[in-house]
Amino acid sequence: MKKRIASVLVALVMVLSLVPKTSWAWTSTVTTLEQLKSAMSELSYNNTIEIVVSGTIEISETLNIRPTRTTNGSMAWYEYYNQRVVISGADANSKLVRAEGFKGSLFNLTGEQGYSGAGGSDHPAYAALTLKDITVDGGGDKTTATNPAIYVSRYGTLTLEDGAVLRNCKSQYYAGGAVGLFAGTSEFVMNGTARMEDNEADYGGGVPEGHHRGRRRRQDDCHKS
């Protein structure tokens, strides 16, 4: 009997070991800025971090999404874990709002260029933010920012899915009141019913046209609306 139990346990361990780590995701429900920051900064091990926002959260500082070093980070060669964050609303009243007076970006997506081996082979890691069923309000009726609401740099991807609204973003100096793409490897994607509205900047309201270096798919609201 003991041998049979041991055999079953060994078989179970072997099956679990075959489950890819990248297939897992975990979800946190947040109601405050501190909870949102904490959930976004979790060590993801290449898994997706899913966050549900309940109510309205005021953002008074830039929230960074960046890959984290693997356990090889202290060695001469290293790689990074991708950091992929999905933020959705608990209901129709869920919002992320710029705090009055805060002029920086609400989110900054910056990937990393890792290196591995004697030849220095590239191993880029990605920073990704997906918004769905939630409104992000840039607070442009009260504050004119100096940066776009969402700054997307190297190896960064911003995706707006069904129900995502990026609105009321007003910015000086930087191209794009709502989204700024600042590297050839950055990307902005809009799908389904996602929309941008009432955004304004020196160069392009939502996403600048002809003033960015990244890729954009589905071109909507590229000027002041």
Report residues per predicted region.
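Hydrophobic beta-strand segments of well-ordered beta-sheets in folded domains
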Residues: 26, 47-55, 83-86, 129
